[in-house]
Amino acid sequence: MSISNPSAASEHLVSVSAPAKINLHLEVLGLRSDGFHELAMVMQSIELADQLHFRNTADGSISLRCDDSSLSTAGDNLIVRAAHLLRERSGFSDLGAAIELQKRIPIGAGLAGGSSDGAATLVGLNGLWNLNFSQGQLEGFAAELGSDMPFCLAGGSQLCFGRGERLESLQAMKASMAVVLVKDPSVSVSTPWAYGRCKELFSSRYLSKESDFEQRRQQLRESSWLNPLRADDPPPLRNDLQEVVAPEVSAVQTTLKLLTDLPGSLAVSMSGSGPSCFALFADVASAQAALQLQQPAFAAAGLSSWCCAFRCEGIKLEA
């Protein structure tokens, strides 16, 4: 890795798109020695994204502004944390940035919006500050900041193991696949609560041996997600947190019921720890038609909805 002189850092505006993700498979295998859950997941980027803009500051300050006043822009925000971490690792303490966030991914939705914003910050400032950190180094920084962040950085279709930070790239899903995504804007779910509740309810069925973990990983590697539409059967969506969250969050129950009624959907599931849920479609046209038909029912229930195509790549600097 070669870090350029910060005096050569870019003076122009750098923009980065930070896409949301959905969980096509989320399996809680057991507990790790560090207290986190061991997971086996399939994660997929979708075309619903926040937009971040970065400019250098002459005084070395790092600041964040957002068009959503409900989002904290203080030091606990992953964008700010990522900026400080990258500056620390660069060795140039006088680097600064003014960051603007256009928030489009709903907050607390199980879509990794915060993680994606943090990952986008690593990419954006790596370019703005002319640091030349490699993709592998950025993924290492991302793993320090959050379990979902390495996936958000890499994007596309990935098997995710460990806490979610260990990635194995899948053959890209069919580019035409899409989802109808639905969320109650008045409801959010705490990820730590969801995993804590999962432990309370289902720890008796947790696996404990690494050999058992690896057996489940291998089964997922060999699953039909490698070719999701090669058969007429619906793709095998799974989310172990759904059976934790849905019984206690009525909005998730309502959302899943309305999504199940969509014509042409292949399968329905909750994403992450919720409360966002989605219906999977073979192509964007089918998803758009189904959403148009059901949108009045979603609106009547107070639900926000989107049609999102699958995204085949991760976070990149925009021209």
From Swiss-Prot:
Residues reported in the UniProt entry to bind ATP = 106-116
Q: Does the keyword ATP-binding apply?
A: yes
Question: To which pathway does this protein belong?
Answer: Isoprenoid biosynthesis; isopentenyl diphosphate biosynthesis via DXP pathway; isopentenyl diphosphate from 1-deoxy-D-xylulose 5-phosphate: step 3/6
- Can you tell me which residues the record assigns to a coiled coil? none
Question: Under which EC number(s) is this enzyme classified?
Answer: 2.7.1.148
Q: Name one GO biological process term.
A: terpenoid biosynthetic process
- Please give the start and end residues of each transmembrane region: none
Q: Which reaction does it catalyse?
A: 4-CDP-2-C-methyl-D-erythritol + ATP = 4-CDP-2-C-methyl-D-erythritol 2-phosphate + ADP + H(+)
Question: Sorted alphabetically, which SUPFAM superfamilies does this protein's record hold?
Answer: GHMP Kinase, C-terminal domain (SSF55060), Ribosomal protein S5 domain 2-like (SSF54211)
NCBIfam families this protein is in? ispE
Q: Indicate what this protein is called per its UniProt record.
A: 4-diphosphocytidyl-2-C-methyl-D-erythritol kinase
Gene (UniProt): ispE
